[in-house]
Amino acid sequence: MANESILPAELIALARRVVVENSALGRKLALAESCTGGLVAAALTEIPGSSAVLDRGFVTYSNEAKIESLGVSPDLIDTFGAVSIATAWAMARGALKHSRADVAVAISGVAGPDGGTALKPVGTVVFARAQRDGEVQPDGEMKLL
């Protein structure tokens, strides 16, 4: 069937909400994804009308990709790690800089099954947002999912 998705219904419902609400505001989004590997962009593009909202997405799984594609400082990654609010915010700022979006969202995390630490166990995910309206304060959140 043409309308079925391989993505979970809950994810599609959230993506629909993102598309509808941002479309109503006339707002364009850019994504900088690491641990999700493009899944957020895939979910958004499942929604009719997403082309009015999604400007572009960057999948920067490796530290090198974060540095080369988004301009994240190697020193920032060395100091705080790839899974940190500082790095995620730099990813969001880089996505904003390299796009025509009004808002950029970045996601980085420890997907597992290996790679976790006592401070950042497997399942730790960091979200950050940057806006083009001149906001200069980091807006991010770290969660254990």
Regions found by a protein language model. Give the residues of each.
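Short alpha-helical segments enriched in small residues
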Residues: M1-L145
